[in-house]
Amino acid sequence: MKQRVYNIVMGVVKGFLPFYLFTFLPLTSKAQTNEQMGGVYYAYPIESGIEKPQLQSAPEGYKPFYISHYGRHGSRWVTNDNRYIWVNQHFEDQKNLTPLGKSVKKRLDQVWKNAKGNGGKLTALGARQHRGIAKRMYQNFPLLFTADAHITAHSSIVGRCRSSMLAFLGELVTQGCSQKIEAITDSADMAWIAYTSPEEKALENRTNVPLRISPERFIKSLFIDPSKVKEPVKLLLEINTIASDMQDVELGVSLYDIFTPEEMHAAYEKNNRGMTIVHGDVIQNEGIPARCAISLWQRIENDADAAIARGGVGADLRFGHDSNLYRLLTLMGIELRGEEYNYMDEILPMAANLQMVFYRNAQGDVLVQLLLNEKSIGFMSWKELKQQVADRMHYFEHLRQLCALNTMVGTAPANTKTAGLFGKGSEEHGQTLPAVLSPNGQNFWTPQTQDTENKCVAPYYYTDSLFQGIRNSHWIVGGCTQDYGSFTLAALSGKLRLEPEERATPFSHSEEVSHPHYYAVRLPKEHLKLEVTGSSHTAIFRITPEQDSPIHIVLNHNSDEGEGYLEVDTMAKTIYGYNPVHRIYQGWGERAGIDGNYLLQAYDPIKDYGIDSLCVWLTFEGKAFEPIILKAATSFTNKRGAENNFAFEVEGHDFESMMAQTAQQWIDRLHTIDVEDPDTARVNQFYGALYRCSFLPREMSDVDGSYPKFADGTIMPESPRKFYGDFSMWDTYRALHPLYTLIAPKEAGDMMQSLVTMYEEGGWLPIFPCWNSYTAAMIGDHCSAALADAYIKGIRNFDYEKAYEAMRKNAFETPASIEEYANGMGRRALESYLKYGYIPLEDGVREAFHQEEQTSRTLEYAFDDFAVAQLAKALGKEQDYHELMRRSENWRNVINPKTGYCDGRHAPKQLSRKKTDGGLFENNLDFIHRKPYITEGATCHYTWVCTPECGGIGRGFRRQG
């Protein structure tokens, strides 16, 4: 007989009372008897005499006063007569039956003779089961059923549930309960006693757990011409159901002999998996079953609180269904763990029940003992239990919200009215990713439809129709830069194809699932499903073939320069490689001093392997519906860093546990802000935006704090804090970094310290640091703005004195050498800005990727000066403060007084020895189209960029009428 162990973890309530977190752990991996492999059809083992109740003594001083009960109906016939009829139709052609088939027909005929008209009805055994439970409840707690007891009984409107209730109540009377109990069966109660939500129904409809065995042997044993059986898997499962139900109807008919042990276990496993996914506590179901049980729990909680307030003794008895009981256990957090699924014969046999027995002491403290199928799984304070369930309700609502946000926003071309007006080419794409990641983690695990790391090409576009694999990406999300140090993993069947264009395979968005913690896609031509979950430095891939076929895993690093390294260790089943990172903008094409190092670990036997240029492949012997698991780790330091990250972050995880961990990280990040709105689309939009706010900057350091030195690549020693990189500051200083100071202050401080560290290691505060390098990619000096804002907002966990030193250097000094300046150090065109109070059109700003854009630079430098001034004032640098505040008025120098809009302005032209023209404006009257002195936009919106002085700009417009 299968053994069980009940794990009870003790804690303390109110300093002295024991409470218990409930854990129910099977010791064995599969049932040992055919009856147990019936799963939810397993006849209640206590009534059968196979097992015994296990009641635990209450702590000293506590006496029982109330029982809250929810029971599944007892043993029944198969739910519908039509299921018997459908099976029997296959045996009508006796000429097609084997000798065993003819024997089975006789047995099925006998079953049908008794089953006809009884589909779904309670059997005599089912009634006995409930009488037995009632008898033991009465005998264990007789004082709860006295004449003055307050007892209620409710059932689902389904006949077998009401019959179970009547049998239960009848036995209470037999035992001596003198209290008259009304048996209530009301359709209004279905909203809580047997509720199934629309999202739960949808989950049931989309869940299709495969049978992990071929039905071929089974069908051939029964039919001479197996081809006449059109749904062989369904027939095997339906006959298995009838066979399992024989223990519930007591006909003395057995069908177990027609199944092999492997077929029995495969059916058992399929049913367990399906029930676990649809009703259990697994991350894949997005918390839907638990949310479905909330109304039932609320009824239980309200009834219990009423009983406590009322005083006296009593019981609330409820009779429903296995699915509702299972969802209730899920919501309550009663862990019912198996290896990959729960065991329905242990949790939900016929007549399964949860009894919550309430105890009270003289001080009025209330404890609850939980009895699952009449076995104690511990005591807990009622207050603590209510809080635990409330916390779980909160968690499952957050999980729902996490799964509801749309990760695809920004992956298609813009379709707004202004699309194409201010942006062009790649600027008309949102350039986002539907990636799996930890908030601000090192890697984005994203689907790939574009095979390049080149500038302005995101890895994934929604309008593409061919899927190339899952990329480990370091794309600068939302921008037009480059990916770097990446690799892509593809899963194929059939012919081995190495080139990305060759292995590209059709996919449909209807067969994609994309969440921040999980991505999955079905690839119909490959006959497989590919899934990925991940954390900051690591990921787990799960490839599930749909048929027996070799599965090829192709991994390539996406080096457009054709550089890199690959090695395969077949004994250890590992792949290691690195993809060198190259700079763009300043130092275009040069090595950045870092590599994307990665490690891939396989666990299945490798059938074949090979390396071809920048590709490596592993071939496995794929078995239908048996997942192939691969684990990956990365590092920007070296191979050892990747190995350490692997050991710390992923080695001890399975797919589901990592998925759950990453989901929790996202819940923690997103619900630093709780929003409510009757319009759920607006709520989803908000959290989707917050998801996209959590990509950059990324973690560059390893789990031990090691990181590549900025602008150098030398491996720096372990540090207790994270080192961040990829600050696309022109995009993020206005809103993103101020947001971090509010929702993630510790991380905000680490990010600011990372900027200070870059200054210390590189000599200059960077402008737009990406791929661990100086870039000067965009305009402004906005690291200064972010640092000042963090300090003013109360962030102190960074070296703000050193930060001010760096900010002041950028604001007042220009690099002494052209090499430093060309490398991206210092403000662009600072000399012109300081000389004229603006950057004139004559200064072409040649040592920058974005050349010209003089007016925009002036406006942005004025804002940066204002920001640096605020930190100067806070640190007592009065002289600097006054000078910088004077310079912060420079925005006025590029506002054309004739139009009120910003405009291009020339350097002053000498009219005579003592007179200049003061610097003439372009007098532009086209306010809605791009101009070379404006950055990626038009004067109609760039006029407003100097945020602290929007009021002054507005007054200027009013003067223009």
Residue ranges and their predicted role:
Residues 15, 66, 314-316, 403, ...:
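A generic hydrophobic-helix recognition signal that picks specific residues
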Residues 118, 122, 129-133, 161-168, ...:
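Stable alpha-helical elements in mature extracytoplasmic
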Residues 22, 71, 319, 408-409, ...:
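Alpha-helical architecture
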Residues 290-301, 314, 318-332, 860-899:
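Extracytoplasmic, non-cytosolic globular domains
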Residues 400-737, 741-785, 791-859, 866-893, ...:
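Accessory carbohydrate-recognition regions in carbohydrate-active enzymes
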Residues 32-152, 156-316, 320-400:
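Signature for phosphate-centric chemistry
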Residues 1-32:
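Bacterial Sec-dependent N-terminal signal peptides
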